Amino acid sequence: MTALPQDTDWTADASRPAQARIEREAHKLEKRLCREVGRAIVDYRMIEEGDKVMVCMSGGKDSYTLLDILIKLQKRAPIHFDLVAVNLDQKQPGFPEHILPEYLAATGVPFHIENQDTYSIVKRVVPEGKTTCGLCSRLRRGILYRVADELGCTKIALGHHRDDILQTLLLNMFFGGKMKAMPPKLVSDDGRHVVIRPLAYVPEKDTTRWAQQRQFPIIPCNLCGSQENLQRKQVGEMLRDWDKRFPGRVDNMFNALQNIVPSHLMDGTLHDFQHLKATGIASDDGDKAFDAEEFPPAPALPGLQVVQIS
């Protein structure tokens, strides 16, 4: 038997295919993120020529992903728009103040750190054990609107993704008795600011993978996101479970938000049921109430055998 050379590098040879696969998957993920963010921007006309977009940075995976992909799209977009990254330092104890400024400086994107002690206000006003999310978000929103005015920004970009939108829909249905989600684009209550959500088509699993791939310096939120047993967390876990057990279900739920049939719901403000009368004219929105809905067959549950009974 011929002996192998002693200097044979087995580790290097074995690692090349694995490394190539990792790089290939990362490239596919980047292309998908750019495609989905670009599609949302076009579908809802989120960014226009000459816009100055304020990208709100929390230090979480989603806002990092949002800024990162917008920087990539800015370089290839057919229009000119500017970016400015803004972080609100809410003076939480132990908050690593150096992380975001150092990261943002390295990107080359103009940035602004707004220092406001909302942490003390929230802790003083909200009783111990109660959810702080509502008050924290209202305080943060007001400050960010003011900063947008001061910086001359025409759009405010938030990092909410597809799963956030679906969670909000289900939370409103389960606990609020209304069909309401997060819009991809909205005008603020005072009519002065346009808020956009460029990650609207992006599933959370993609922002998680991108954050890992890019090794973003994640800053955890100790005020709201880390509180246990919140309704949003429970709904999020339910959606993730559905996504694993019933492939396509979450996608179809999201698609339903873009495919509304008001005449087949029960909201009289969206469809005039009061004055509905027979006209003798065929309607595309006509009566199919007695037709059996046709749906694709659901996949069998794990461990169960599907038996056809004739």
From Swiss-Prot:
It comes from the Bacteria. It is found in: Cytoplasm. It is an enzyme of class 2 (transferase). Binds 1 [4Fe-4S] cluster per subunit. The cluster is chelated by three Cys residues, the fourth Fe has a free coordination site that may bind a sulfur atom transferred from the persulfide of IscS. Its EC number is 2.8.1.-. It catalyses: cytidine(32) in tRNA + S-sulfanyl-L-cysteinyl-[cysteine desulfurase] + AH2 + ATP = 2-thiocytidine(32) in tRNA + L-cysteinyl-[cysteine desulfurase] + A + AMP + diphosphate + H(+). Keywords: 4Fe-4S, ATP-binding, Cytoplasm, Iron, Iron-sulfur, Magnesium, Metal-binding, Nucleotide-binding, RNA-binding, Transferase, tRNA processing, tRNA-binding. One of its GO terms (cellular component) is cytoplasm. Pfam families: ATP_bind_3. NCBIfam families: PRK10696.1. Homodimer. The thiolation reaction likely consists of two steps: a first activation step by ATP to form an adenylated intermediate of the target base of tRNA, and a second nucleophilic substitution step of the sulfur (S) atom supplied by the hydrosulfide attached to the Fe-S cluster. Belongs to the TtcA family. This is tRNA-cytidine(32) 2-sulfurtransferase. It comes from Paracidovorax citrulli (strain AAC00-1).
